Amino acid sequence: MQIKFILIFIVAFISVAATSAQDSVFNRVVTVERDYQPEIQQASKLPVTPNFIKEEVEPNSVVYSTYSIPLVVDFNLHPLQAAKTDFTPQTPLNGILEGGIGHRNSHLLFGYQIASAKHTALNLYASHDAYWGRDALSQSLLGMQLVHHFRNMDMYFDVQGNNDYFTYYGKYFDGNQGLAINIGEPVEHQNLWQVSANMGLKSTHKGDVQYSFQVGYKAFIAPQYTVENQILTHFDINWTSNKKHVAGINIDVQNMLYNTLKPDSTILNRHALRIEPFYEYKHKSIRLHAGVNVDLNIGTGTLLSSVENIAFAPSPNIEFEWNMMDNIFHLYANAKGSIGIRSVEEYLGYNRYLNINQGVAFNDIRAYTPVDAQVGFKIRPIKTMLIDIYGGYAYHIGACHMEAILQDNSPSVQEYKLWLHNEQQWKVGAQLHYHYKDIIDVNLAGNYYFYPLGRIPSMDPTSPNFLKATTTFDRPQWDAYARIDAHIDSKWSIYSENQFVGGRWAYVAKSQQRLKPIISLNIGGQYSINKWLNVYLQLNNYLNRKNDIFYGYQSQGCHFLLGVKYKF
């Protein structure tokens, strides 16, 4: 009976994948069984950079009682990134409906468990966030997921669709001189679509051998430009000995196939294989993961390979943790690397306002990071406080940088072009997390960056001219983050969230232009009417700052959102 169910499941997946598309998050299981506690959410604040779904493992939440996993530390805080709604899978409630509206923005969130049996669950979810006006931005998502639990494994299938709509509203901004031109409505706009489907299985038995397998399809669609098809396959297996020693292998295959709507465009289909053999040692106070990523890309590039259109490069995947003083002092270090395939999705994820034609023909595969390492220690001076201090170094071959193009001496930003540059980056930073009796939560973070300088190549690859840079471009020199949540009583809760980013420069018409610091101050509050109904109010960017996100593109000003959250 179990084999029969598996065969039916596979046939259903193939028929769907041939006509639709999918999300490619490995081992991702979404559920709508959630605990909707009165928490403050940043539902209305749209991100200023596209937030496409990628193949990555979500970081675990900080747990003060165990405190055994290093905090995930990004190389910079993402400016004005929207906070996502968080859920805890505990409550038997079947769904949630959340909506809000402001003077220039709207928000909608829906999740419902259509069917639930002892071993099977079917979930439906959707969301929509929009900001209106000449700097319009709309992001929508609709998805479905099916999970079935067998005796010794779980099987899942999900399908999802995304849409991003935005306008090209860029204007020149020069320090305190204000906006120069183009005060009317922009005439250019763009829709980006993504559809995806995944099917996978994961072992759940208590034996020494564990495995998982997933195959997925994803289509990224830029109308009138191209359709980027990706087939993603993942397999891993590991064997545990004596509960301390683990040996295994991870295998990932990525195939990218293009359909272009412009016959004069030259696009190379690309294929990537990654194999990571690894060894893990687990002890009460020590954890070690030692692996080597062996990457082979076919389509373009050379790197360590002498064969045309084939790129080969190894990189480390090492993680080390040492609980030195019974969860009071923790030392950790890691060193990772990768080689990636350039994609139109990744290209527009860097900056949605880039020239799409250039991205379609962006065949360079040199997205190679030989090493991205950091070392740090965590201190817990009291039970409810965690301090994390760290330093890091990264070296990127083919890091992306932009140039803003000004045509006919016009101060209006006509377009951006992307070029590649090898980049080194050093950083030091710290994070602090504190909570008091589930009443006060404090999260603070700050980073400082240093970039050893090189020579910046001309946009014209045939030109012998070089620009000697005095700084790196599109990167912050420092950033900071502060958030405080206060649960006043069982009904009321308030929060304050603040982000700061500074020391950024833009490359404009082969010259250097300083960007304004990003200062984003946000507050909000929520009132729980009863177990099922909450009302919330948010005020974002209440200083009404027009922060420079990119040269010529500024963030949204002050806006509010009044919303209702209903659980059923």
Protein language model regions, located:
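Exposed, low-structure sequence patches enriched in small/polar residues
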Residues: L97-E98, R287, G291-F568
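Flexible loop and strand-edge segments within Gram-negative outer membrane beta-barrel domains
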Residues: Y131-G143, Y156-Q210, Q214-Q230
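Surface-exposed extracellular loop regions of Gram-negative outer-membrane beta-barrel proteins
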Residues: G111-Y131, N250-V253, L268-T302, D438-I439, ...
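Short sequence motifs at beta-strands and strand-loop junctions characteristic
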Residues: P89, G102-R104, R134-S138, E185-W193, ...
